[in-house]
Amino acid sequence: MPDAHFDGKAFVLTLPAQPGVYRMLNAAGDVIYVGKAIDLRKRVSSYFQKSGLSPRIQLMVSQIAGIETTVTRSEAEALLLENNLIKSLAPRYNILFRDDKSYPYLLLTRHIFPRLAFYRGALDDRHQYFGPFPNAGVVKSSIQLLQKVFRLRTCENSVFDHRTRPCLLYQIKRCSGPCVGLITPEAYQQDVKSAAMFLQGKQDEVLKTIEQKMFTASDQQDYEQAAQLRDQMQALRKIQEKQFVDSGKALDADVIACAIEPDSHAVAVNLVMIRSGRHLGDKTFFPQNVYEADISTVLEAFVTQHYLNRSVPPLIILGQKIRVTLLQKLLSDQAGHKITLTTNPIGERRKWLDMAAENAQLALQQMLIQQASQEDRLQALQEALNLPGLARIECFDISHTMGEATIASCVVYDRFAMRNGEYRRYNITGIVPGDDYAAMRDVLQRRYAKLAMEEGKLPDLILIDGGKGQIRVASEVMIELGLNDIPLVGVAKGETRKPGLEQLILPWQEEALHLPDDHPALHLIQQIRDEAHRFAIQGHRAKRAKTRKISTLEQISGIGTKRRQSLLTRFGGLKGVKNASIEELQQTEGISRSLAEKIYRELR
């Protein structure tokens, strides 16, 4: 149990001189730091020395009310446990990198006519995967480029299996029409092979093959085919110019550089991904809780948190020396092959590192400019509302269509940025459809009932997308919950509903507050309100589409769950069912001629 009078020096004497992990707790029982050690007694005792501690560590030590330890069999095991605990507990004094979703891949499915697709998740040996890519946008743009060059299908099998005529992608020359037999399996497989070779970095081989085909077509006076192959070569060369890294070979590597702004303790880590000699793009990370940490400490935290339990390229190039021996062994064991971490690259690899360092510095500068702007906006809002202090703002919006599929959203702004990991949507049921006041009451009660019992962070300000009626309801809820000390502000649209004409409804004054359309406080309110609106609409549309997809068919007499599922599976969704002829509908299991005619009529 945490003890306000915790004696660290006495506690150290009870620790073994063995490898392990230690967790430091404050008086509230929260874990504020997690660390690993080869020798627990020696490492933990270093925190209770009279000298040599940084101001940050001194502050942390002053808050320690207890320490928990776990002995491990080795330093490697301690590192793995430390990494898992940091990710799960997010202690305030550990450097934290956001644990993103798994990286996306480009997928070629196993099929007589393989499908080209975006994929994120566990890998299946039956299919071909290319990547990983730094973000979804790079994958999607790559798919578009490959469609243009190789004309591979992207449709789901459920759609592919039941098409009777080519789709729009065929008409705009982005697909070769395998669904209706407009290309032979052999010719299609050749296109798949060329696409795979290109993704594997064998661009020159692919270009040479296409060039030979072009000359053959020209010799045979098939000038239309020769022109198509020429265009294909030109498109591939453009892609090659954009993405190829002059490596001399098809190399897989990650290049990592770090930039630090000491005065603000801001840090940016840039990760450049090179796969099969192609520059797939880069991604920048902004860690939390950095304080006065140096570049080596930040990079070591990044490599540990980013690569353990994730696919790793054979080469990782770092912009600063770190303790590589243990990490290199762990990553190699995890990958099943040798992983090399190098901190002193030369030649072309040094150029890659310089590129990553420039990316990190640029991203850091942009982030600091944006943060300064956000700080100015937040300060302006604080002054406009005459509030003592603002850091965390939560905003609510309600979205529905004539009372259908009502969704409430809550978005969070904290520490000068939107925190989308803390966004929440709420399904609103059990109210009169279209009653926005009841919907707002419901979401606020659900959101803040737990907070009233000290189970989470309380906001410094609550924004409500609505006018006096919504604010009245919100005030009643907060009084009922005993949270009426949290300021509420309603954001009401002006008479013409144009941005810049918003009225701010303040419960503590009679008149609405009007801010000039160029006021930084208004810009911040608009930013947060628009994000709540977007998030609510997105959830509402998804819920409405799901509801309508089910109900439209089930409202037809004779269509139950089983027949509905058969129809949706056969035609790849409700749109396919609507486009089907009576004869095509009748071919579905369980659908008679008369029922097919009824479905056809009802969906028109």
From Swiss-Prot:
Gene that encodes it: uvrC
Any one GO biological process: nucleotide-excision repair
Predominant localisation class: cytoplasm
Subunit structure: Interacts with UvrB in an incision complex.
Function: The UvrABC repair system catalyzes the recognition and processing of DNA lesions. UvrC both incises the 5' and 3' sides of the lesion. The N-terminal half is responsible for the 3' incision and the C-terminal half is responsible for the 5' incision.
Ranges for domain UVR: 204-239
Sequence ranges assigned to domain GIY-YIG in this UniProt record: 17-95
SMART domains for this protein: GIYc (SM00465), HhH1 (SM00278)
The protein's name in its UniProt record: UvrABC system protein C
CDD domains: GIY-YIG_UvrC_Cho
Source species taxonomy: Bacteria, Pseudomonadati, Pseudomonadota, Betaproteobacteria, Nitrosomonadales
Membership in a protein family: Belongs to the UvrC family.
Localization (cell): Cytoplasm
TM region positions: none
One GO CC term, this protein: excinuclease repair complex
Protein keywords: Cytoplasm, DNA damage, DNA excision, DNA repair, Excision nuclease, SOS response
GO molecular function, one term: DNA binding
